[in-house]
Amino acid sequence: NQNSAVMIAKGRINGIEVTAGAINFEFIGGSVGAAEGEAIIYGVQHAIDNQTPFVFFPCGGGQRMFESPIALANMTRTTLAINELKKNNLPYLVCFTDPTAGGITASFAMLGDIHFAEPGCLIAFAGKRVIQATVKEELSSDFQTSEFVEKHGFVDRIVERKDLKTEISLLLSILLKKDNAVNEKQINETSDNIEPLAKAAS
């Protein structure tokens, strides 16, 4: 019974208050139009007003082109909203799901302080066949997968969905300097690479 592909929620992840958003691919392919843009901007404003991190789970093929320039305008509007979040020194974590493509990738989804991605998910702007026809050469079989994108520096860490809660809360604990919520032994056992990620985001 959704009237928008984007869902915004507030809550806690292991005791850390967050504002979170996600795109439902079942709603017109997760495309972003006027309502979705407003929802994302609302989520960012809620995070700013309540001084919480913003965690987003993108999934979709891009802008809703039957809404024409209104949909495209939301690439700019959501980007400006994320910039306001960063001005307030609030963490913005993106967790890529399958697929994330088009104008979603070309705007707010690629602006995270840290980028997580689920294994094997598609992360792209234009499709593989379009690019292959343009560059006139064969592309690798893993082209535009999360593993390929990680290898080229656009994803920081590939994480199974079942492990996202732990990874997100540990990283936020470090970024927010909530020392009492962080167990050093747990960090070392759970993620050897969490410290470099925290440094990259700070």
PLM feature spans:
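Conserved catalytic cores of soluble enzyme domains
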Residues: 61-179
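A structural preference for short, pocket-lining loop segments at secondary-structure junctions
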Residues: 11-22, 39-63
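Glycine-rich anion/phosphate-binding loops
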Residues: 1-5, 30-45
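Glycine-rich phosphate- or other oxyanion-binding loops that anchor nucleotides, phosphorylated ligands
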Residues: 19, 33, 39, 57, ...
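Short glycine-rich loop/turn motifs
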Residues: 4-8, 52-53, 90
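Intrinsically disordered, low-complexity segments enriched in small/flexible residues
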Residues: 1-2, 10-12, 171-202
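Short small-residue beta-strand/loop micro-motif enriched in glycine and branched aliphatics
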Residues: 28-31, 64
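Extended interfacial segments that mediate partner engagement and assembly in macromolecular machines
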Residues: 1-17, 23-28
